[in-house]
A protein has these predicted regions:
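Short, active-site-adjacent cap segments at secondary-structure transitions
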Residues: 1, 152-154
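Glycine-rich beta-strand-to-loop/alpha-helix junction loops that act as flexible
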Residues: 6-7, 146-151
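Short, surface-exposed acidic
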Residues: 25-33, 97-99, 144-147
Length: 160
């Protein structure tokens, strides 16, 4: 995949459409709970949050207020297999999180996060994706952040 949540957003959209068309009257919270059983990040897309810190496999969604960012996305012609990236993460890279650093990161706006932390610190999946797809290093440019399980990178565009 590209690491932009395409499959997850499609799944969440289907759940919302089914809820509406079948008159199920499920709440957003109920849709998020179903989404967490469907796949990674489906809960986030079902939440309708504009900005959120997402953890676990996307089932923990903590919203926050932040102005929309002007970003640029680059997707190299490398298809990263989401399941394999997560499996490699669990096998080789899973470690206990530094809770002090996590709290610091939660308190910062996105622009500061990108300025102050490395690609590896911002996305735990970058290292396992690199292990599986070493050619990603050709595209890991300064100022660009790895998106999801890959293969896209994004950066915050300078205001002009």
């Amino acid at each position: 995949g590209a690491g932009l949540g395409g499959g997850s957003s499609d799944s969440a959209t289907f759940l919302k459409m089914l809820n509406e068309q079948a008159c199920l009257n499920l709440t957003c919270k109920e849709l998020m709970e179903i989404g967490s059983r469907v796949g990674a990040d489906v809960s986030f897309f079902a939440s309708e949050a504009l900005s959120a810190n997402v953890s676990g496999i996307g089932e923990v969604v903590e919203t926050y207020q932040e102005d929309a960012l002007n970003i640029e996305v680059f997707t190299p012609k490398i298809a990263c297999h989401t399941g394999k990236v997560y499996q490699t993460y669990r096998e080789y890279f899973l470690q206990t999180m530094d809770t002090n650093q996590a709290q610091k990161m939660l308190s910062l706006p996105s622009t500061k996060l990108v300025e102050q932390f490395s690609k590896e610190e911002l996305n735990d999946l970058f290292a396992p994706a690199r292990k599986l797809y070493p050619e990603l290093l050709l595209y890991a440019k300064e100022g660009w952040v790895f998106s999801g399980s890959g293969s896209s990178f994004f950066r915050i565009k300078e205001e002009v």
